[in-house]
């Protein structure tokens, strides 16, 4: 069986000097290898093909047959690595917390321990007749959330 660690090392070698980053590698018991990469400006098919060929050049099909799939992390998929938070700062995201809260807002900041989202809330201010829309920052640790993902908007 092909080891995940081996595939990760091959991918990291290809990534050197590039702005791409590794999101996830999975290797199933029947040697189906799935590699997900990402980039701040999106993933190009030509780069997926190049990475696929690079991996194939490092693995020996004669020794062990495998199926290989290389692609992007997916625009509507939950974030899996910290770099995905970094590249989406300033963009709208959806956050679902472990206690079931679901909110959408602008990703303002992220570091290794937490991230901050600016959320629009209706608040009735003293002396006003109608609630006003205000933005409030909410900060979460990664342990508090079920998932965060880029919110696709068709506005």
UniProtKB/Swiss-Prot annotation:
It is found in: Cytoplasm. The keyword Cytoplasm applies. Signal peptide: none annotated. One of its GO terms (cellular component) is cytosol. Disulfide bonds: none annotated. Keywords: Cytoplasm, Ribosome biogenesis. GO terms for biological process: ribosomal small subunit assembly; translation. It comes from the Bacteria. Required for maturation of 30S ribosomal subunits. Belongs to the RimP family. NCBIfam families: PRK02001.1. This is Ribosome maturation factor RimP. It comes from Bacteroides thetaiotaomicron (strain ATCC 29148 / DSM 2079 / JCM 5827 / CCUG 10774 / NCTC 10582 / VPI-5482 / E50). The gene is rimP.
